[in-house]
Design a protein with these regions (language model features):
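Hydrophobic transmembrane alpha-helices
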Residues: 99, 103, 232, 309-322, ...
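Cytosolic ends of transmembrane helices, especially the final helix of ABC transmembrane type-1 domains
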Residues: 240-243, 247, 271, 316-343
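Membrane-integrated ABC transporters
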Residues: 1-49, 59-97, 103, 110-115, ...
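Cytoplasmic juxtamembrane "membrane-exit" helices immediately C-terminal to transmembrane segments
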Residues: 113-121, 125, 187, 205-227, ...
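Short intracellular "coupling" helices and adjacent cytoplasmic loop segments at the cytosolic face
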Residues: 3-6, 62, 119-120, 128-158, ...
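Primarily ABC-family ATPase nucleotide-binding module
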Residues: 344-390
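Juxtamembrane loop-to-helix connectors within ABC transporter transmembrane domains
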Residues: 22, 115, 135-181, 237, ...
């Protein structure tokens, strides 16, 4: 079963990498994004982990011998302080923890900006590819493809498709964070680790059906968006014809049906996400409180370890929830991703081949084209001003 799951994950990652490269996301950009994510996670985990020696330092009132005797971690801390010739103190420990959290904020800020830069570049690239391909396509493609469908892809579905490409990298951020905090739990107590695994597995199974339904709802929403765009392009170009034909009420009624369908699909998707977001936390919190009771009454764990466990669990909950929401969002955006992929395939296969051009080796007389211009309605710019091909 585990091998089967690993094969599925490996196949998905391989397909995602190929699709990402096809849309313009380079391996170098992926590496930089993952590196920034790892650095932000590492600094956060170490910053949070510093609270354990801080609590221990306070409990033993700074007695280094007692600290080393009661905790293996403190021997490494003492060695580190000795290397830099610094005396262990509460102030230094607090400054180190604060410095690590500041570093985490810096790496997080850099990652968020880098994510936005990459996303917007990919969105621009796909929009340019669709428009350029549409202009270069043959008349057969123009005749069979509604303008509204192309508009919907460029203005709406490209955004969703690029988000679906970027989401696996964002999800990887949370997986790295989860692994980091989980390693801290292992250092604290194996009992805590096993219980946390059970709690999060139970909580993760709850939204499984809602996540699967998101894919169907997402495809329905893409279809609804396409129908609305096609309807608008066809009607807004000829409003006088609608008035003259006396079909105003019919057209209004039809448009209202389309927007109602659009609204229902949006609401269905939002409900599925809300269920995933809200119903997982009570399960984890309830199980954590049960474990807190047994860890205090039966396992006799130290107070600082129990406190740090609760802090980590409270931090892990939004991480696990975010991973599930990322998976659900990827499912919900499959429709946009599939539409963009299919549109690019069809457009690239419909490119018009210019076989009617003959090269002229010489001219007996001069050919001159003068004062050739074209203006779009409401625009003063001559679009042929810099064009030398007529």
């Amino acid at each position: 079963m585990m091998i089967f799951r690993k094969n599925i994950v490996g196949k998905y990652l391989s397909e995602w990498r190929v699709q990402s490269n096809n849309l313009g996301l380079s391996d170098r950009e992926i590496f930089i994004f993952i590196t920034l994510s790892f650095l932000s996670t590492a600094t956060e985990v170490f910053g949070l982990g510093m609270f354990l020696p801080i609590f221990q330092f306070i409990r033993f009132k700074g007695d280094v011998d007692e600290l080393v005797a009661n905790s293996d971690v403190w021997q490494y801390i003492i060695d580190g302080f000795s290397y830099f010739n610094i005396a262990p103190s509460l102030l230094v420990l607090l400054l180190i923890a604060f410095g690590l959290f500041l570093a985490r904020q810096f790496f997080t800020y850099t990652r968020l900006i880098y994510d936005t830069i990459i996303s917007q570049r990919l969105i621009q690239l796909q929009r340019n590819r669709i428009f350029d391909g549409y202009i270069d396509a043959n008349t057969s493609y123009h005749d069979r493809t509604p303008v509204g469908s192309v508009m919907n892809i460029i203005l709406t579905e490209v955004n969703g498709a690029i988000v679906s490409i970027m989401l696996p990298m964002s999800m990887l951020v949370y997986v790295i964070m989860f692994s980091g905090y989980f390693s801290v739990l292992i250092l604290l107590s194996w009992e805590m680790t096993i219980f946390s695994i059970v709690a999060f597995l139970i909580a993760s199974m709850i939204p499984k059906s809602w996540i699967n339904k998101s894919g169907t709802v997402g495809r329905k929403l893409v279809n609804a968006n396409t129908l609305v765009s096609e309807f608008l392009v066809g009607r807004l170009k000829l409003p006088r014809l609608v008035r003259l034909s006396g079909t105003e009420d019919t057209e209004k009624s039809e448009f209202h049906k389309l927007t109602l369908r659009q609204r229902k699909n949006y609401i269905s998707g939002a409900i599925l996400k809300s269920k995933t977001e809200t119903l997982m936390e009570p399960v984890v919190i309830g199980l954590s409180l049960v474990f807190l009771y047994f860890s205090y009454t039966m396992l006799q764990l130290q107070v600082e370890m129990i406190g740090l466990y609760l802090v980590i669990i409270m931090r892990l909950m939004p991480i696990v929830k975010s991973i599930l929401l990322q998976i659900q969002s990827i499912k919900g955006l499959l429709g946009s991703s599939e539409m963009l992929k299919e549109s690019l395939r069809v457009i690239e296969g419909s490119k018009e081949k210019n076989n009617g051009v003959k090269l002229i080796s010489q001219l007996n007389r001069e050919i001159a084209l003068k004062h050739v211009d074209y203006h779009y309605e409401g625009r003063k710019v001559n679009v042929l001003q810099k064009n030398t091909k007529y």
